[in-house]
Each structure stands twice: as structure tokens, then as C-alpha cells.
């Protein structure tokens, strides 16, 4: 039913032809979303790509966080990733020139209207627990910084490599 679908537009124009319906109860490529007894379990599932964030995943996360926020049965969210090598290696730069990346581009937009990866960016007021097992780089910090509780395994590493690739970490909420 419509209650299971979250409508979102990567371009923020909110017109019908620009809308993408994402059914949060159906499998999504790159992220798993499961609900158990009031717990929203969110798992980044792109281990072959270092659990990096593909441009199309921004709409998925927006739909997931909207469901967490608006579903009265959800009391807490837990976000983690598959494997123990990478929690999240940030934005998948190999997809930076894709059509999905062009749709998600945030040029000429206020940050608040451009980036929707994390709970804070989606106005989630419920508690969020972030479980980090492995390396967290760049955009992966969105989830860590916005969590109420962070549980890091002994092999967790937190890296901001923006300077190494000639970028400024202007998007991540580090600080």
C-alpha cells in the first residue's frame, strides 16, 4: 500500500515526473532495512565496493530515515555495515559521473536541501545507534556524527581523507 512507499525526488522539484517511489519493505540494492520489535536495522551492503555510498542510495536512505521518523512502531534505529573491513568508505567516486550522481548533485542548493544520508539530515528525532566495524572514511562520518550512541569495534578506524584527494570536507558534519 501507499503507506509503505516513500516518495522522494533527488532533484527536490517534487513534481510527479521527478518522483521515485521507494518501497522500504522491498529489497534495495546496497542497503538492507529490516524492522524487528520496534528496532529499525539498517545495514550498508556494498562490501565489494568498501560499503561506499552510491548516488542512488541517497534516495534509499531518505526513504528509510523517513520511515524510521514517521513510523510510530519504530523506537530506535541501528545502522551498521556488512563485513569487518569497511564500515563505510564514503561516496563512491567511481560513480561520480553517473546519471544518478547528476540527479543527486547539490550544486546551487543549500546543504539542507542537498544531502540526505544521515538521520539528522532527515529530521530523525528517535535514538540512533551506529555500530562501526572496520574503516569509516569521508561520507561515512555522516552516520557516526549523527548517532546518539556509537559502538566501535577494536578494528574500527576513522579517517578523513579529503585533503589527500584535493577536497575540503565541507559536507560532512565533522567537528
Predicted regions and their residues:
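Short gly/ser/thr-rich secondary-structure transition/capping motifs
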Residues: 23-26, 59-60, 108-114, 168
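Hydrophobic/aromatic residues within transmembrane alpha-helices
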Residues: 42, 79, 92, 143-145
